[in-house]
């Protein structure tokens, strides 16, 4: 069962997004398809048995800001993909594993804990994935192909459906790095980062071959600004924002390889619009302008306990006795691993004007 292509007339205030005047934005998207990890998961992980229903994101205080109950989002509220959908005039995406859900305007295939590389590839690099997280990007692509086979009456209909959609591939690859940080050197991790970039590029290539024409591929956030990593490496050299320099250098290396891979894809597929979303600098912008944006805390977790970063690996958000801050809107960091709805909103506000321009929205 397909649906006809139709442009969405999106009216939004650029004062909200970029401090300018009101404008009419028209983007020809029927739907959004999201792939990724817990930064983008709107409820898949909590539906994976046996561990999902007991996951933190399935329980309070996750969802405390929006919609007031847990939804499977690893945050207090809405995610980056939710705000992008809002800008495009589309409803929030339902997770692929939600039974009887409407997928008329797209699907979210992202899963908490997901990796860009398969577990066997990571194991060969000496990286062990926790048994509760075993849904790599390749599995999400298989889900997407299954979805197409179930929702198209012909290859032509599938191609039309895909061409009229926006794809977000990631961000993903964070977990490939973060799982290794406690027991692998930076040099050992750097050795397999090119494989991460290649895996994401191959996924992007597959989407284009299936007919995708507009694709956003985000880079990674600064690894050195995450409370979990600041907790793990308390004596590491820090920059003027309080982030770990060496881990942020790893993020820059990671993102440079991603951009090189995307440049090659643009040459290979000139008919496609492939956009790199600069999550790294968007996040650094939030840290540097925190006070002006309404944040009172930049590196402390809203939900957590202990130490300078309000984070303890042995007492995580959602554990008994672990408190949540009074006003999550004043925090950038949510639980030491993920970000608040307020942070997600400002990241989209930072990125969306350039993204709309590159998508050739008018």
Swiss-Prot record:
What domain of life?
Eukaryota
**Which interval of the chain is the signal sequence?**
1-23
* Tagged with keyword Coiled coil: no
Presence of keyword Glycoprotein: yes
Sites carrying a glycan are: 100, 118, 151, 202
Enzyme Commission number(s):
3.1.1.80
The reaction(s) this protein catalyses: 17-O-acetylnorajmaline + H2O = norajmaline + acetate + H(+); 17-O-acetylajmaline + H2O = ajmaline + acetate + H(+)
Q: Which UniProt keywords apply?
A: Alkaloid metabolism, Glycoprotein, Hydrolase, Signal
Q: In which pathway does it act?
A: Alkaloid biosynthesis; ajmaline biosynthesis
Q: In which tissues is it expressed?
A: Confined to roots.
**What residues make up the catalytic site?**
38, 335, 338
**Homology family:** Belongs to the 'GDSL' lipolytic enzyme family.
Task: State the name under which the record lists this protein.
Answer: Acetylajmalan esterase 2
Source organism per entry reads Rauvolfia serpentina (Serpentine wood)
Q: What is the lineage of its organism?
A: Eukaryota, Viridiplantae, Streptophyta, Embryophyta, Tracheophyta
